[in-house]
């Protein structure tokens, strides 16, 4: 096993990324402005809804949604009594390593009962309040001392009774906020508890009440839109050229797994079309051109099945089993809600609500091959201090050790890196490189304009539509041959791709849905499923 092949792939990928950066992405400036105006108005609407609901939940206690401490009190109905002791108890904060860089401290470990006792004994219940005007300062927040002659001093002092706010908040017996229950020490922060969208969304499958669920959904939407406006809309506005093009910088050596990242602007974490339609602003550089996108179906799940040789994964892929429906049944949620949890166990997901943990246990039992492989990865990391992929790519874990609970440190990374690395740092680049070669060999005007994790995006010239579809299909389905040529790997997992095309990157129509299954013969032939006669000839 050698890193030479990985280095060669990286160099080939660098040439392709250079072409993509130089080609750039065309932006519809008018659509971008319309999007910004529309969602800026939506954030104003959501903020009004959130403030009204927060007032109902907290009484007269003011809540600043930009304050992590206020959000923690609102969602969890508890307030930290001593922040210094709190940080020490849960080992919250950062430390400087031997290289001088800062990193998060390793959190203290608790079982569920001990954690519950620890956080409750170090926080106080938050109650609703009733506001009244301070009688000392008459609501002005400041007072004056009376001089010996009976007149008031000109010097004004902050009122001690109301701390300068002019209002007295009197507690009543009703609990304030939404009374969420933190699950582990990882949910603790310096100000209380986590209130990020990922954490809050996990509570939507719990029995927390309709008001809490409605508020979480509204807050997560508000928070997401603010992030999207800042990251994508403002990012595009800063990077766009006078000719309405952006040229993102793609990087192979930033993420720990080797997955691509990009900046100026960030185009690797694009939101789904139904979440934030920024993709509508991406159009073809030709007046009657098209945007063509090819996606791999369940790429990381299939890669996990291949690396672990899990027979259940092979069987379900070949039969077209809907894995999200299994998740939905186990968690008693809709299929759409289930999607966020389906593949979490691939990366070591074990904690969460009761329903989530029930599903995670069922996943481990159903996909016993993946579970056994996860255990073997942990053993390999402990023994060799590194993990090696079939491609030769290595991930170092010099400080990995056993925990007192029987697991290993860096458990999530040990499970995640091989899957994400082989899928998006090995397989996807091979397809991208081969597709770029096909475009050049056919002297196409159409260009690859973007790639996002498990997809390839083409800007298609209007006269090259059919050929571009065929070449992209061929490029994406080249994984079997490319694995064999580059690494002498027999990639035996069926490959599924979906192609969509449209006038912009949002409004795409499905045009192709293929499943390719490698045969077991030494000639390495493939079975083509759902492919037209014309495409079969071209491929």
Spans of features found by a protein language model:
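Conserved catalytic core of nucleic-acid polymerases
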Residues: 18, 22, 129-154, 159, ...
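Glycine- and acidic
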Residues: 2, 21, 25-33, 214-219, ...
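Flexible loop/turn segments at secondary-structure boundaries
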Residues: 72-73, 167-169, 257, 262, ...
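Structured core elements
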Residues: 17, 26, 64, 261, ...
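A common structural junction motif
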Residues: 474-486
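Catalytic core regions of nucleotide second-messenger enzymes
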Residues: 486-493
